Amino acid sequence: MTLRKSLLILCLVIWSSNFVFGQELNATVTIQSNKVDNQVDPKVFIQLQSQLKDFLNQRKWSNDIYGNEEKIECSFYITIESVLSPNVYNAKLSVVSNRPVYNSNYTTPVLNMQDANFTFKYQLSQPVEFNENKVQGTDPLEANLTATLAYYIYIILGLDYDSYELRGGAAYFNKALNVVYNAPEASGINGWKSYDGQRNRFILIDNLTKSGMDKIHEVIYSYYREGLDQMSTNFETSRGTILNALMTMQEVQDANTNTMVVPILLQGKYAEISGIFGNADKAMKKQLIATLSVIDIANLNKYKEKLE
């Protein structure tokens, strides 16, 4: 039995009279279409936004029971870049998920992903459906809409479960891998193949499932469950645990120089990490900076300004 499921059963026992159970996500969907407003009826994207919100929040994505207070907070931001042909759009997708930290009012970012290869077909009254046994559907461009979203939902679930139980997200990463292996194929559809750029869906799920990068799951569990979740009871020990997790992340980076998952896991973490280590001793800060100089070069100068 997973930790998440155990917690939910406890909640059921204590609050059964007031607790309402439902699906896994509390997702928001925002579609920005100003670049094509003079080409497309605004009703199209208003309806699509509503349908996608229902698709994400009303479908069951796992076998576990979630209470309202256990739902995963996440957001999907779609920017329509251009109209490729009638009802076919090129877009950028931003996916963000968060997780509460135990015994606090703090919410920590888990996934912060930008996907620039989001092409799909949609027209008014089109059903928004996904069948994991027939990912390609009957029209690849229509299917790519929900296949891409389903893929990221499984990534969100996998990371969330990993953060509560060591390697707890394996089943969901395998579901994401199944989407990749059976992804829609058509002209204009990109992001599913290993050669579709340096950052794509194939590479991300490959990083999360191949044996050579298994330590990344130890990092996720250690950082969140053994680190952040324990800070209210033993701050110093938890801070050391988080530093060790980041050092293990460096080991993963050193062994897999082109990894995609390390920078994604660190995306949006600057404020959190610098806050945790702001009053650490000089030796700990020195070790942290040395580690970040390998795994988060993009933000290294900001860390140095804050911590040195």
Question: Where do the PLM segments sit?
Answer:
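Second-shell loop/turn segments in exported
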Residues: 35-42, 135-143, 254-255
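Sec-exported extracytoplasmic/periplasmic mature domains
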Residues: 53-61, 154, 158-162, 274, ...
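Flexible, glycine-rich surface segments
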Residues: 157, 164-258
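Acidic/His-rich structured neighborhood in mature extracellular/periplasmic domains
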Residues: 87-203
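A cross-kingdom marker for long, charged
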Residues: 30, 213, 217-308
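Start-of-domain marker
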Residues: 23-90, 101-103
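Bacterial Sec-dependent N-terminal signal peptides
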Residues: 1-25
